[in-house]
Amino acid sequence: MGDPAKLAAGIKAALDATAIAPAAAPPTQQPPVDLNTAGIDAALGRKGNPDGGLYKFNLARQDTIVDDGHLVPPTFGVTTTVNFQPLGEGTAAINGDIVMTGPEVQKVIQALRAGNISLVTVHNHSLTDEPRLFYLHYWAVDNAVTLAKAMRAALDATNLQPAK
């Protein structure tokens, strides 16, 4: 892994060489989300967050994830994401990724197919993660609450942390 200060200095040098500007601060107030967010929250059994006109869920697993002997926190991309993009009149496009263990994969696929949510890809990110994780990307367009209800079955097939 290496010394964190040296790693950070190396990343900064690489970013400086690309002339990529630092990220702007997020707006202090998010634009309104033109969806029934209360209905989406009720269907998923948890509360999402507005972000740039989208309505998002970022859901951590209950498992402790270890990769190559190192603890991997949820903020390092081992979370399930559900994004709702308003399309008007209660319709949304959803996409994201569901993090699963091997025994969960078929249950999630069956739940998504039953809800008419398209599977985009199933893949993994690491060779040595424990438990072994798989990621499923999905996509659908329909009534936002209908999509949330369909997603709930898929999410319930995984070992997510309980809603707060």
Predicted segments with their positions:
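A mature extracytoplasmic/lumenal domain signature
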Residues: M1-G2, I11, R61-D63, I98-M100, ...
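Hydrophobic, ordered structural segments
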Residues: M1-V33, A140-P162
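Extended intrinsically disordered, low-complexity coil regions enriched in Ser, Thr, Gly, Ala
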Residues: L7, V72-G77, G102-L127
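Intrinsic disorder/low-complexity detector
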Residues: D16-A60, I65-G69, P73, T158-K164
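A structural detector for beta-sheet-dominated domains
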Residues: N58-A60, Q85, T101
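Intrinsic, low-complexity N-terminal interaction/targeting segments
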Residues: D63-G88, V122
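Acidic/histidine-rich, surface-exposed loop or edge segments in extracytoplasmic proteins
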Residues: L87-N95
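Surface-exposed aromatic
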Residues: A93, E130-L136
